[in-house]
């Protein structure tokens, strides 16, 4: 009889994992649903209310998470290679003793009296969804299989964004402004060699030291790659893979106080994820990993919109990066997690079922991929710097390096092999035409937002 009762109890526990809790129950406690489904202890201590004090919901610190104070010029050079996260911070009280949670866009969600917690069902602003109006459209219309299990966190995750840079400084500036208040550390790798193996100046380091990026300097971890991998000149994919491997392993080793559930995202310099999606990953529990972003594709500028989306797996938690991908960014981007030897052990140790998903969809972009988006001089430099892997290597042909030829490619949207593409219509007023910082600084980035060589009908 006792054995029968035990079996019945075990079946009951198993059934819980398939139950969809009502929204009212899910909203009652951000940690209640996660305690049933994920079976993992919180990674940071929770702060108890003071005796006799009012209960409160905690306000996210995603816009107030500096890692280092800006450095004096005398110390800036020696500190480029170090970055330390502060100790754990629990989300703060709402001002004036009230209790409110914030929507992901910063608007208050609910408020209550002095002694009793009160939750109010939200009327969501356009672009936001869910019981607490914190789920952005790029998640609502994604293929995430666990949307009914999403709950706000009391302690935000830290977000690490890793990038290799060559000469994409305008796009890097856009990334810093677009994501600067939600990303906690930008790990940027620069080498004194191009991807082709030729010497190059350390331009990004120079810009860090001369103050060009002072507004974000406290969040930048500079990684210097001082060598070119053997065989990289003959096989460009060796160099391409090595850049991402070195970026990830060397960069992560220099970050202190990491937590297993911190978010790691590795991008190419011409890939910019949407802020709303990154903020969701920071503030919510219940999503699976690894994850990708559906990105709007464009060529030479945002004015040549290409069909479809770019969908590249580019993110996971720090725990998965280390346990499954051996802290190798190229494995994250190019290898299916279930082919990696550590994935089953990671599933068992965390209680998480690994299911790959993508933020956004082919109809709802979750970022931007702007390929060859430079001035003609920038495209020339990309041609001569490119790895010896994408064939034909157009930088080897003198006529393809001619600036007038490059200007004509930008004007027509053509490719180096002489082909022409059919482009969907692109309107600067469309929802995801370009990152907001670009649009707010239209004159400065006009060459990326309007075709500078388009011939106006009727013009002489």
Predicted regions and their residues:
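Short internal beta-strands
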Residues: 187-191
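Juxtamembrane luminal stem/stalk of type II transmembrane Golgi/ER carbohydrate-processing enzymes
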Residues: 1-162, 167, 406-460
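Conserved beta-strand scaffold positions in the cores of enzyme catalytic domains, especially
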Residues: 186, 220-224, 290-292, 362
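Conserved catalytic core of nucleotide-sugar-dependent glycosyltransferases
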Residues: 271-400, 406-407, 411, 415-416
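Active-site-proximal specificity loops/subdomain of glycosyltransferases
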Residues: 109, 151, 155-159, 193-266, ...
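Short, well-formed alpha-helical segments that are part of the catalytic scaffolds
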Residues: 168-181, 185, 195-207
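A short acidic (Asp/Glu
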Residues: 134, 171-175, 197-201, 273-282, ...
